[in-house]
Amino acid sequence: MPDMPAAILGLILSLLLPGGRFNAYFTPAFTDAAYQKEAAAKVLKAWKPPASQPTGKKTVLIAQIAKDGTLAGLRDHLMTGAKSWDDAAIAAVRHAAPFAPLPKSWGFPTMEVHFHFEVAAK
């Protein structure tokens, strides 16, 4: 099996959320912009902002998308400490899955993407 590309990630999408900002970072070797936009849009569509929001913090989740588009893994990298915000971010990624199958040209079993859910500073 070939080695995975370096974990340096490239920003593909940055959008405003109610009360904050959403960023999606994909492995740079994964250059299918249409797929990236579609995957990020699915997460954003599944986002349900909580009533209470922490100030000036962010949740960072690292997802592994399998060849068939299923969520092969999801782990937290950084949490705000505000359970409602962190849980809403996790739920958005889980509800967005499954994603479209990875392109046949992608020569790895999974693709990594980091989803950032930032709370606006007040």
Residue spans for each PLM region:
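Intrinsic-disorder/low-complexity signature in envelope-associated proteins
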Residues: 1, 5-8, 13-38, 48, ...
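Conserved "boundary/linchpin" sites in short secondary-structure elements
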Residues: 17-26, 40-48, 64-78, 87-101, ...
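Residues that form or flank phosphate/diphosphate-binding pockets in enzymes
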Residues: 84
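Short, small/polar residue-rich loop motifs at catalytic or cofactor-binding pockets
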Residues: 54-60
